[in-house]
Swiss-Prot record:
Region (Involved in splicing regulation activity): 93-153
Record's protein name: Histone deacetylase complex subunit SAP18
Similarity comment: Belongs to the SAP18 family.
Region (Disordered): 1-20
Gene: Sap18
Length: 153
């Protein structure tokens, strides 16, 4: 049943994104987990009903952009407001084929600079209600890891 539902939603997403009327559409609860070491959480931290302790709960909509989410995180973590702070976003989702979670990096933003991923939305990255968002925050005085995609998951 869940597989059928996911296929139907993927077919719907092939159409151009329709703007969401935030006055009439109920927001979703986005569970966000952050690190300040530039690396995403390990997938085993999400196992057996457990989640990392660094959780933010944000009410938002599927058309929320990475830049908008960056601003909300900076409200909670003043040290992340420094110009040059790097935010790397990943969706953490339940793997339907085998037990456990998987991660999909979706983009990055930087405090004080415009970037190509700023206008990327949750909806455009196939975020599903119930997925988590993991944000690896790198302070400006440290370079972000060369590529988190090289890490085996």
């Amino acid at each position: 049943m869940a597989v059928e539902s996911r296929v139907t939603q993927e077919e719907i997403k092939k159409e151009p994104e329709k703007p969401i009327d935030r006055e009439k559409t109920c927001p979703l609860l986005l569970r966000v987990f952050t690190t300040n070491n530039g690396r995403h959480h390990r997938m085993d931290e999400f196992s057996r009903g457990n989640v990392p302790s660094s959780e933010l709960q944000i009410y938002t909509w599927m058309d929320a952009t990475l830049k908008e989410l960056t601003s909300l995180v900076k409200e909670v973590y003043p040290e992340a407001r420094k110009k040059g702070t790097h935010f790397n976003f990943a969706i953490v989702f339940m793997d339907l084929k085998r037990p456990g979670y998987r991660v999909k990096e979706i983009g990055s933003t930087m405090s004080g600079r415009k970037g190509t991923d700023d206008s990327m939305t949750l909806q455009s990255q196939k975020f599903q209600i119930g997925d988590y968002l993991d944000i690896a925050i790198t302070p400006p005085n440290r370079a972000p890891p060369s590529s988190g995609r090289m890490r085996p998951y």
